[in-house]
Amino acid sequence: MEEELLSAVPCSSLTVESVLRVATAGGLYGLCAGPRDARKIGLSGVSQASFVAKSIGRFGFQCGLVSGVFTMTHCGLQRYRGKNDWVNALVGGAVAGAAVAISTRNWTQVVGMAGLVSAFSVLANCTRTENPNNTN
């Protein structure tokens, strides 16, 4: 039933929802980690507040970017292939990891991050419990 509902929703809508949720979580992480990092480097007052605001924006943007790229790639592949399996998660994770690491311009980091995000994506996809006989 849920699969039928998801197939009726456009990929762009799923991507926007994913970006908003995960970017909010990233912003909250930046709100928690920003003051600690500011104290570590000895900031206080207005400079600390500025650092925290930048941390919120940076973490929110990075998390939203990864989420958006992954969701759009995963959904697009799912629609193109007509299957919802680990291959979609593998490719989506690789593309999302590469998109984040490309700013370093270090190909070792790009490949490493693509592999890491891809592995976590496949692991998350494989650990989902889907029982087709469940009537709940």
UniProtKB/Swiss-Prot annotation:
Residues 1-59 are annotated as: Contains 4 beta strands. It is found in: Plastid, Chloroplast outer membrane. GO terms for cellular component: chloroplast outer membrane; plastid outer membrane; pore complex; TIM22 mitochondrial import inner membrane insertion complex. The chain crosses the membrane at residues 18-34, 56-72, 86-102, 110-126. One of its GO terms (molecular function) is protein homodimerization activity. It is a multi-pass membrane protein. Belongs to the Tim17/Tim22/Tim23 family. Plastid outer envelope porin OEP16 (TC 1.B.30) subfamily. This is Outer envelope pore protein 16-4, chloroplastic. It comes from Arabidopsis thaliana (Mouse-ear cress). The gene is OEP164.
